[in-house]
UniProtKB/Swiss-Prot annotation:
Gene: gltX
Enzyme Commission number(s) from the entry: 6.1.1.17
Entry's cofactor comment: Binds 1 zinc ion per subunit.
Assembly and oligomerization: Monomer.
Family indicated by similarity: Belongs to the class-I aminoacyl-tRNA synthetase family. Glutamate--tRNA ligase type 1 subfamily.
Protein name: Glutamate--tRNA ligase
The keyword Ligase is annotated on this UniProt entry: yes
Gene3D superfamilies named in the record: 1.10.10.350, HUPs
Primary location group: cytoplasm
Catalyzed reaction equations: tRNA(Glu) + L-glutamate + ATP = L-glutamyl-tRNA(Glu) + AMP + diphosphate
PROSITE patterns for this protein: AA_TRNA_LIGASE_I
Residues spanned by motif 'HIGH' region: 9-19
Binding site for ATP: 240
Length: 471
């Protein structure tokens, strides 16, 4: 049997991390078994579905590199197929037309609730032989079995049973002729030959209804696996108040897709004590049996740790392709300065996100108008004038511009003046970067470049001279 899974989001908003984890688990299961992964857009909610949401879902899937083998399919383009199946069910007697008014259904609901009963349709039209005009408004309901139970072996949770007496005669076509969500899902899974449905636990109550419809159609019933919800670190359901929940927001915040995928796969699944997984390792090791039944707690600090790990372990050239977007957001012109791959090597240890990296790299490419006030007050004092003049002259004398030779020039300055490296290094750092913090000074000065470094030292000397004149 060829394994076939699907990810079927509703385009009523962005792709959130819960949906992304479900997509990842479905994708991994298909890849692990050499099967196929289908992308299906469940856009039957015409009022809430938007083109922007569809684009956001596609963007998120593409950014995570969760490629699909089929699709994207759109339910709104398959209404003719759904209605044809409903008509066949009406002919076969597994569905019926219901003419009950909204007022009657509301009264029925109130009476049942007053008695402490679960609100459900009482089947009045199921057993009615009243004649109705062809144009009289009606819905179509599925004739759910009235006895027995539905049992399915959830691949994560084990056997789950629902009594058919607890299930309603589900509306499968509205009065306007449009098919309903639960019915469309069934026909899609049947037509697309889905073997395993992996989805959130909020769909558990839909499963027995969908199984009964599949059986009424004599269609194969897929295996089901319901993934537990994701909570915030406070134990409450993950929401915007816990920070970013949109996949693309994590991109915007400077996370690498590898970090988010690694974090999401471990958010409810484990393989021993291993924390770091390549994509290939995920595919090789993933199984539904190792997915937890319990809710998972989202921990942003752990995700940040993973992101820092991947910034420093993935190829700098690859990380640079993602950094480029953030550089563009900061409007930094990188034509005159180090290659972005070199920048990743320079700032990787200091920066936990690519956004932070982009926001702290401007001095490598563009001149700054003023020095950081606190750093200048502390380090660009008259006592720093001589070390800056000497190190400037030694840097100017370098013919082979390298980080090693820059280091020798700084060391030689300290030796000549018989002062510690800090007496030379700190004023030099503020002079060339405008700030009091940077990566190692030799590689920083080397990356900034000879001409630009000397110009900035002269600017710092001018700042010191002006400061002296005011004393």
């Amino acid at each position: 049997m060829k394994i076939k899974t699907r990810f079927a989001p509703s385009p009523t908003g962005y792709l959130h991390v819960g949906g992304a984890r479900t997509a990842l688990y479905s994708w991994l299961f298909a890849r692990h078994h050499g099967g196929e992964f289908v992308l299906r857009i469940e856009d039957t909610d015409l009022e809430r579905s938007t083109p922007e949401a569809i684009e956001a879902i596609m963007d998120g899937m593409n950014w995570l590199n969760l490629e699909w083998d089929e699709g994207p399919y759109f339910q709104t383009k398959r209404f003719e197929r759904y209605n044809a199946v409903i008509d066949e069910m009406l002919e076969a007697g597994t569905a019926y037309k219901c003419y009950c008014s909204k007022e009657r259904l509301e009264q029925l609901r109130e009476e049942q609730m007053a008695k402490g009963e679960k609100p459900r349709y009482d089947g009045r039209c199921r057993h009615s032989y009243e004649h109705h005009a062809d144009d009289e408004p009606c819905v179509v309901r599925f004739a759910n079995p009235q006895d027995g139970s539905v049992i399915f072996d959830d691949q994560i949770r084990g056997p789950i049973e629902f009594s058919n007496q607890e299930l309603d005669d589900l509306i499968i076509r509205r009065t306007d002729g449009s098919p309903t969500y639960n019915f469309c899902v069934v026909v899609d899974d049947w037509d697309m030959e889905i073997t395993h449905v992996i989805r959130g636990e909020d769909h558990i109550n839909n499963t027995p209804r969908q199984i009964n419809i599949l059986k009424a159609l004599n269609a194969p019933v897929p295996m089901y696996a319901h993934v537990s919800m994701i909570n915030g670190d406070d134990g409450k359901k993950l929401s915007k108040r816990h920070g970013a929940v949109s996949v693309m927001q994590y991109r915007d915040d400077g996370y690498l897709p590898e970090a988010l995928l690694n974090y999401l796969v471990r958010l409810g699944w484990s393989s021993g004590d291993q924390e770091i997984f390549t994509r290939e390792e995920m595919i090789k090791l993933f199984s539904l049996g190792a997915v937890s039944k319990s809710a998972s707690a989202f921990n942003t600090d752990k995700l940040l740790w993973l992101n820092h790990h991947y910034i420093n372990t993935l190829a700098p050239e690859y990380v640079a392709t993602h950094l480029q977007w953030h550089i563009e957001q900061e409007n930094i012109d990188t034509r005159n300065g180090p290659q972005l791959a070199e920048l990743v090597k320079l700032l990787g240890e200091r920066c936990k996100t690519l956004k932070e990296m982009a926001q702290s790299c401007r001095y490598f490419y563009e001149d700054f108008s003023e020095f950081d006030a606190d750093a200048a007050k502390k380090h660009l004092r008259p006592v720093a004038r001589q070390p800056l003049e000497v190190v400037r002259d030694k840097l100017s004398a370098i013919t082979d511009w390298s980080a090693e030779n820059v280091h020798h020039a700084i060391q030689a300055t300290a030796d000549e003046l018989e002062v510690g490296m800090g007496k030379v290094g700190m004023p030099l750092r503020v002079a060339v970067t405008g700030a009091g913090q940077s990566p190692a000074l030799d590689v920083t000065v080397h990356a900034i470049g000879k001409t630009r470094s000397i110009e900035r030292i002269n600017k710092a000397l001018g700042f010191i001279a002006e400061r002296e004149s005011q004393q």
